[in-house]
Amino acid sequence: MISIQSVNPNEDSFDLHSKEGVSYQISVYVPDTAPPQQGFPVLYVLDGNAFFRTFRDAVRLQARRSSKTNVLPMIVVGIGDARREDFVSERRCYDFTPPSSSLKLPKKPNGEPWSETGGADTFLAFLEETLNPQILEHYPIDTENEALFGHSLGGLFALYSLYTKPSLFSAYIASSPSLWWNERAILAKEEEFRKNLHNETLHKKLFVSIGSEEKGHMVTDAQDLAKRFSAINSSSFSFSFVEAKGENHMSVVLAVLSQSLRFISLRT
């Protein structure tokens, strides 16, 4: 049983606990228009304490005239740490990083040791088995039109989700993905996904962005990924890549936000 608090007529908030006892703050925006027969598309936003309000307002303002903006009315679900901080480093470091039998990481800029890593499968299970059923029970969602947004390590997680459990979402927004993590171990999962893409029966969409002013390896890693996915010719896969000129690791989210919303709003 969850206790849903109404923040305003179109927005709810509640705390949700994982099976492991981790508490998350869940924020939900619902358009003030009547839902279509199949329900609203839904966008799940990682680092919700930092990004939920930004995505909420972008959807709210643009979906008022979808015929002009090409942004559909959609439910926005923010997933944040229950401590209400924008970013909780140790939580992100665990939830968003893939498990690995061997871990090779650079030193952190502040010289502190890395906190526990490798919880991506556990977090995926929380999304699928705990959060998604609650959203489905309480809100009119289109179960065939669910998207996931993640930035930085969250972008890495979005890609990991696509590569390892593509049935969970139909569209993915990977903003400045941390492909460097653990000496680019994610590339093995990517290769396996690309090889098996012809077996995918449901259409998948992937939007990747990077700021041109980010660290060199971030930019080249994203560019290389874009080359690989742009070469795919498949009726079951759509891909878009944006390198935002003059944008840095944080500003890129705002710079390409509307483009990413238009992309996931495209009907396939």
What are these regions (language model features)?
Residues 1-268:
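Non-catalytic cap/lid and distal C-terminal segments of serine-dependent acyl enzymes
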